[in-house]
């Protein structure tokens, strides 16, 4: 997609693409120095925080988070992302973990972004199960009762047909 809306920039920086400047998968130009992503902000506020970025889609780490997370895992399957996150939680190696799953996006681009598409719904349900397994692993930590975790799940974009959608309520 030539001028694809890339919500990873919004998710990671908290500002609209008019400010962070990322409009396609080249991530160039960008204004991450002016509008740093949340890993940089957390590191500034809490220098000792242990961070991990575990992703299916490599450009998230390669173009945005490389050098900013203590642990970088890239090009994993969605099951691999889940498993690596559970391992990090079990080993207590990270205080902040960013995950990127991609199977729902693949299903949308392949079969269609619609609740009427069984493959799309199945991918959402599989992702929901993975998130549930991660939350269960988090809650199984021996120190969980004394910890204060925040789990945020967000979609980076909707779609129309098999393409990226527009900024409409139905496609968000």
Segments (PLM) and residue ranges:
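Aromatic- and acidic-residue-enriched segments that line the glycan-binding/catalytic groove
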Residues: 66-74, 163-172
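A short beta-strand-to-alpha-helix junction
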Residues: 25-35, 118-125, 168-169
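Active-site-proximal alpha/beta segments of enzymes that process anionic O-linked groups
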Residues: 1-92
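Solvent-exposed coil/turn segments that connect beta secondary-structure elements
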Residues: 16, 102, 156-158
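Structural beta-sheet core signal
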Residues: 53, 99, 151-153
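Short, flexible, mixed-charge acidic loops at enzyme active sites
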Residues: 7-13, 111, 166-172
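Active-site His/acidic residue clusters
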Residues: 59-72, 86-133
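Metal-dependent active-site segment of extracytoplasmic phospho-/sulfohydrolases and closely related
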Residues: 126-167
